């Protein structure tokens, strides 16, 4: 039984940071009634299997699939060059048998590329690289309860709203074709970084690494994760993977990461994003009633040692490879999936059901 483990990093940012989202309306029908036992805000589906009362099991909607575009490298490179501004230097390098443009301005390097795995855009201020690196280490250590210095919702000396507008402006330069975005904002103050430094230095010394590059690098930082949406629904994020490595059916999710200081955007990471294009005429009916039936069937075949709680059922889009007559093709299509989040012994996991055949996505 394959499950997608939810990265606690994302969960902490969602809980501790601020989420900016436009909420839409979904078609609903009357929930059906079942004979179950209420247990602390849950109902019992099977022995040791519970479903949250907050889930509308009568929800039903019809959604479309979308063709996929890989993107336009020339357009993406031009947008990146315009963002960097006057004085940007271009260097043509050969990678994977083709020419590729890398951009440099002052201490900032950037590039955009498009391949069979989608559109990639990266930007790094080399002077600020230690700050971004230390943020990642800081977050990881906090998740593992090794430090308790910041909740990643610190008061900083510049406006996170201004940082958010800079990120939105950056994204507007690219023709990504998504309906909307959710933005999750985390902030870490200079003082929190300075309090974390001794712990980081101790760990680096143990690993034989040099702490010198981190000295005097502490400053207020705003980190923004961006989750693209089709209609009202997010696409699968970077914590999700389907298929097998090196196979055509391998599919990774994506979200965008931006790091912003008072001086501006210092780091961008947009990795492997597929662009939705033409809307297909066929409709896909998504029913939470049917999803609950499939969940019940799934766990009927499993001997549960611990209680399992179904916390959330929602719709997410995924750029899955087209399959026909048992064959998998490089062509992809965004299609809606039913994402089921469960909790077992305090650990959150997620698995996906495909409403085209109501099988679990592997």
Give the positions of each predicted feature:
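Sec-dependent N-terminal signal peptides of Gram-positive bacterial secreted proteins and lipoproteins
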Residues: 1-24
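Intrinsically disordered regions, especially transient/low-confidence alpha-helical propensity segments
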Residues: 10-12, 80, 117, 355
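Preferential activation on post-signal-peptide N-terminal prodomains/segments
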Residues: 18-247
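A short, surface-exposed interaction/processing loop segment used at functional sites
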Residues: 123-150, 250-286, 349-362
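Segments that shape or occlude catalytic/ligand-binding pockets
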Residues: 166, 170-334, 339-348
């Amino acid at each position: 039984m394959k499950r997608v483990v939810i990265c606690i990093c994302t969960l902490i940012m969602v809980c501790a940071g601020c989420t900016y989202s436009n909420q839409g309306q979904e078609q609903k029908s009357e929930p059906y009634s079942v004979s179950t036992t209420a247990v602390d805000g849950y109902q019992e589906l099977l022995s040791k299997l519970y479903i949250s009362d907050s889930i509308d099991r009568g929800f039903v909607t019809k959604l479309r699939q979308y063709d996929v575009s890989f993107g336009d490298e020339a357009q993406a490179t031009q947008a990146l060059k315009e963002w960097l501004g006057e004085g940007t230097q271009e260097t043509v390098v050969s990678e994977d048998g083709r020419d590729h443009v890398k951009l440099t301005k002052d201490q900032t390097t950037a590039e955009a590329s498009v391949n069979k795995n989608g559109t990639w855009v990266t930007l790094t201020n080399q002077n600020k690289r230690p700050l971004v690196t230390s943020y990642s280490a800081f977050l990881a250590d906090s998740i593992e309860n090794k430090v308790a210095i910041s909740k990643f919702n610190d008061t900083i000396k510049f406006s996170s709203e201004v940082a958010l507008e800079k990120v939105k402006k950056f994204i507007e330069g690219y023709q990504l074709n998504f309906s909307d975005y959710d933005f999750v904002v985390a902030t870490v103050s200079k003082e929190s970084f300075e309090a974390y430094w001794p712990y980081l230095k101790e760990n680096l010394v143990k690993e034989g690494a040099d702490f010198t590059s981190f000295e005097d690098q502490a400053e207020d930082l705003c980190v923004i994760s961006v989750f693209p949406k089709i209609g009202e629904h997010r696409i699968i994020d970077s914590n999700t993977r389907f298929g097998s490595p090196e196979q055509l059916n391998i599919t990774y999710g994506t979200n965008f990461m931006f790091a912003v200081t008072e001086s501006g955007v210092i780091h961008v990471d947009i990795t492997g994003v597929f662009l939705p294009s033409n809307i297909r005429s066929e409709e896909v009916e998504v029913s939470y009633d049917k999803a609950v039936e499939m969940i019940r069937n799934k766990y009927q075949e499993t001997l549960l040692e611990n209680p399992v709680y179904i916390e959330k059922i929602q719709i997410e889009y995924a750029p899955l490879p087209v399959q026909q007559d048992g064959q998998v093709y490089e062509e992809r299509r965004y299609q809606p999936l039913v994402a089921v989040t469960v909790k077992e012994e305090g650990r959150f996991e997620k698995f996906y059901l495909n409403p085209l055949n109501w099988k679990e996505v592997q």
